[in-house]
Amino acid sequence: MIKLTARQQQILDLIRDHIAETGYPPTRAEIAEILGFKSANAAEEHLKALARKGAIEMIAGASRGIRLPEVQSGIPLVGRVAAGSPILAQEHIEDYCDIPHNFFSPKADFLLTVHGMSMKDIGILDGDLLAVHKTDQVRNGDIVVARIDNEVTVKRFKRERNRAQVELWPENPDFNVIEVDLRDANFAIEGLSVGVIRRS
């Protein structure tokens, strides 16, 4: 298992996203511009570190000379999420499901195994795979994947305008609403539910 720093993971994710969207890797200058580096040389140093760790392969003499070894196709299936690390960090990915990202709309960036029956009344059951579009831009009523104090949960999002409190509603009367005070809770929206896959 490759251990990457947060910055290295960010660059690797950028390379993967760029290849998925355009079919080819970004240049050093593009990486520097997107991530706010002062020069392409700074991006080059990070790329060399990634290559030393085996996360990428570099092809000399080509401006887009970056290759991902053993590129996996399909949507990553995320397992247990470690505290303080990005949800799509390599160590969280258990497998890849052979489904095109654009099978869902908006596209699914990852799959998450549902644990529990708190959302059963809208057909999200224990053991299902939830297709998730990675974004923190959600609206009232959306089904979201949220992280609270490093626990990941699937709930319906509600927030009143100008209030520092978020409510995460279950779709099962046996479960309680989770209230989160944004001023003191370690809270983040990890993504928006875009579909469910039932395991047979």
From Swiss-Prot:
> Keyword annotations for this protein?
Autocatalytic cleavage, DNA damage, DNA repair, DNA replication, DNA-binding, Hydrolase, Repressor, SOS response, Transcription, Transcription regulation
Q: Which reaction does it catalyse?
A: Hydrolysis of Ala-|-Gly bond in repressor LexA
Q: According to the UniProt record, which residues make up the DNA-binding region?
A: 28-48
Active site annotated at which positions? S118, K155
The record describes its quaternary structure and partners as:
Homodimer.
Q: Which HAMAP family does this entry report, sorted A to Z?
A: LexA (MF_00015)
Q: What is this protein called?
A: LexA repressor
Organism, scientific name: Teredinibacter turnerae (strain ATCC 39867 / T7901)
